[in-house]
């Protein structure tokens, strides 16, 4: 189609943000158009189209329909569409979003297909190449890294629709910018990430918490002391308070020394006549602490500050796949708090010129910050979402279950990358969290293919339906090839059976008898 060719005309009552048009040919939903009138040069997105035939509107008899079809021609058909007005492209070189016009265009104004060169100016000036427009393969889409990281991001989609690939592409692009990234990797998908086109700077951080530095309730939770254990918890708190008054962290050489010191205090209480009535509860608390030493040894330590483990300008991966939900909550909250406090301290003590920006990616965000359940991590994610921008701490929530993700935290994510969502409750939850997600764009979510996404927010000049690049490398999020694995396992199993049969055939014979 000629870029200067008129594709249709505005009709009906027009608005500054939305137009109805009558088209010559059906444009692709998600494609871009241009409208010139008065002193404005507007860019718009085709949000929906319908086709009709006035001669067939009230036909209910199939024979009548077939007879009419014999005599009809293309002039009987009409195409109507809806355009979302995105703004005046004369503002394109200015910082920020395009501005809507003050006056809507009149009905009958011609509509043109936006040319590729214009769209390349709109979408090609960012830092992070994420993909290309679904409707224009030659138009690359690049996101503004400053606005993506500082105004927070949510990556939302059904399982298998390309979330992990999107994260991998973003990691590759952030790596090019020498960004400092921290990934809470719930399923170990990224710990072995490899890229063919770019040498990734990857640093693995083992999930650890300083048992001396966490608060008393977190220690009790980690030890498995029930939140309703109104006798066990006060005794543990009392023991910790006395220990910390007597000895500092450097006085303990190992975790065992510290926990055994607490257990020693509890043993003293147990043998004290004043606490005889609670002897059973105290003993249970001792058992819980002993169990913690045995079963939580992999994540508890002393003399540890997670900030010292984070490498600047690296993709820092924290594999969490071996931790249960409770341990994940404590580890995430502990590290998230440490990062926010550290970045705040740098700004307050040294000033903005010494800031150390960091972008934190939280996989399975609906488990860390659930909608209807209180968690420690949700508190700190919410704080980062509200305060992080001022201190260079960016947030990315990744989830396949948006409806169970905390709405307050999600609403602070101004940037959205949304792939296919079918459930109406998921769609509604996301729409309520984003004022920029129109009803017509929501309707597009069910028809997106694997790897396609709607991107909107400050990181992009105007909303776009994008084909996200296929990550050129390896990570752990791809679907398993079940048929291939079954076949391979079957061959190996049959080979072992054959070997056993051959071995048994000769095993009982004495060849030298």
Swiss-Prot record:
InterPro entries: HerA-like (IPR008571), HerA_barrel_dom (IPR018538), HerA_C (IPR033186), HerA_central (IPR002789), P-loop_NTPase (IPR027417)
GO MF terms, alphabetically ordered: ATP binding; ATP hydrolysis activity; helicase activity
TM spans (from-to): none
Reactions accelerated catalytically: Couples ATP hydrolysis with the unwinding of duplex DNA at the replication fork by translocating in the 5'-3' direction. This creates two antiparallel DNA single strands (ssDNA). The leading ssDNA polymer is the template for DNA polymerase III holoenzyme which synthesizes a continuous strand; ATP + H2O = ADP + phosphate + H(+); Couples ATP hydrolysis with the unwinding of duplex DNA by translocating in the 3'-5' direction
Family matches, as Gene3D superfamilies: P-loop containing nucleotide triphosphate hydrolases (3.40.50.300)
Documented EC number(s): 5.6.2.3, 5.6.2.4
Broadest EC class assigned to this enzyme: isomerase
One Pfam family hit: DUF87
Top-level taxon of origin: Archaea
Assigned keywords, A-Z: ATP-binding, DNA-binding, Helicase, Hydrolase, Isomerase, Nucleotide-binding
Record function comment: A probably bidirectional DNA helicase.
Membership in a protein family: Belongs to the HerA family.
Record protein name field: Probable helicase MJ1565
């Amino acid at each position: 189609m000629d870029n200067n060719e008129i594709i249709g005309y505005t009709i009906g009552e027009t608005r500054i943000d939305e137009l109805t048009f009558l088209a010559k040919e059906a444009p692709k939903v998600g494609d871009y158009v241009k409208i010139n009138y008065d002193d404005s040069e507007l860019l718009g997105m085709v949000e929906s189209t319908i086709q009709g035939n006035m001669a067939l509107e009230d036909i209910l008899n199939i024979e009548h329909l077939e007879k009419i079809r014999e005599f009809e021609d293309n002039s009987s058909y009409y195409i109507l569409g809806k355009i979302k007005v995105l703004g005046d492209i004369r503002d394109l070189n200015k910082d920020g979003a395009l501005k809507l016009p003050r006056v809507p265009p009149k009905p009958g104004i011609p509509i043109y297909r936006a040319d590729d060169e214009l769209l390349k100016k709109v979408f090609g000036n960012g830092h992070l190449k994420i993909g290309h427009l679904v409707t224009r393969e030659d138009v690359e889409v690049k996101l503004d890294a400053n606005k993506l990281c500082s105004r927070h991001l949510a990556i939302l989609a059904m399982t298998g629709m390309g979330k992990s690939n999107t994260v991998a592409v973003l990691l590759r692009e952030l790596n090019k910018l020498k960004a400092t990234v921290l990934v809470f990797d719930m399923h170990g998908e990224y710990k072995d990430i490899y890229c063919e086109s770019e040498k990734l700077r990857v640093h693995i951080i083992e999930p650890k918490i300083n048992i001396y530095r966490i608060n008393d309730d977190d220690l009790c939770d980690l030890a498995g002391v029930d939140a309703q254990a109104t006798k066990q918890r006060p005794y543990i708190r009392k023991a910790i308070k006395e220990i910390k008054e007597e000895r500092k962290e450097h006085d303990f050489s190992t975790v065992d020394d510290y926990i055994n010191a607490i257990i020693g205090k509890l043993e003293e209480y147990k043998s004290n006549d004043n606490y005889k009535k609670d002897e059973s509860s105290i003993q249970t608390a001792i058992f819980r602490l002993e169990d913690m030493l045995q079963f939580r040894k992999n994540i508890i330590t002393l003399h540890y500050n997670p900030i010292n483990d984070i490498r600047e300008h690296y993709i820092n991966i924290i594999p969490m796949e071996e931790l249960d939900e409770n341990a994940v909550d404590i580890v995430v909250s502990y590290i998230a708090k440490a990062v926010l406090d550290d970045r705040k301290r740098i700004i307050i003590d040294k000033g903005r010129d010494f800031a150390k920006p960091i972008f934190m990616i939280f996989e399975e965000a609906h488990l860390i910050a659930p909608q209807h359940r209180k968690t420690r991590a949700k508190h700190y994610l919410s704080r980062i979402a509200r305060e992080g921008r001022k201190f260079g701490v960016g947030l990315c929530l990744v989830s396949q279950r948006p409806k169970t993700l905390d709405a307050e935290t999600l609403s602070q994510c101004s940037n959205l990358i949304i792939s296919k969502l079918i459930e109406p409750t998921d769609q509604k939850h996301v729409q309520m969290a984003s004022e920029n997600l129109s009803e017509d764009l929501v309707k597009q979510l069910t028809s997106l293919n694997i790897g396609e996404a709607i991107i909107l927010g400050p990181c992009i000049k105007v909303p776009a339906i994008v084909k996200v690049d296929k990550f050129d490398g390896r990570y752990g999020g791809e679907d398993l090839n079940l048929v291939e694995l079954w076949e391979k396992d079957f061959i190996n199993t049959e080979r072992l059976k054959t070997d056993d049969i051959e071995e048994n055939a000769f095993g009982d014979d004495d060849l030298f008898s």
